[in-house]
Amino acid sequence: EFDLVFIDADKVNYPTYQLIAFNMLKKGGIGVLDNMLWSGKVIDPCDKESIALRETAEIIRNDVRLSPLLLPLRDGVMIYQKMK
């Protein structure tokens, strides 16, 4: 188990990486995902990367075991703590 997991990889697979990261984190651990706003392209309804980033953000937001925060710095950074 890890205290911190940082994800900065191909955006299409972010949902899968998030699941892997969650399982690797210990309780109280921190997850960090880079490029979550994708230079503002995250709102593009047809872009594969944008769709995957929105799906990842929704997964994190809706998981009651996580306490997330989205920082709108440059490309966006999502940080969460694994609560349970």
Residues of each region from the PLM?
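C-terminal substrate-binding/active-site "lid" region of AdoMet-derived donor-dependent transferases
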Residues: 13-84
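Switch II (G3) loop of P-loop NTPases
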Residues: 6-11
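A short acidic, Gly/Pro-enriched loop at the edge of an enzyme's catalytic core
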Residues: 1-5
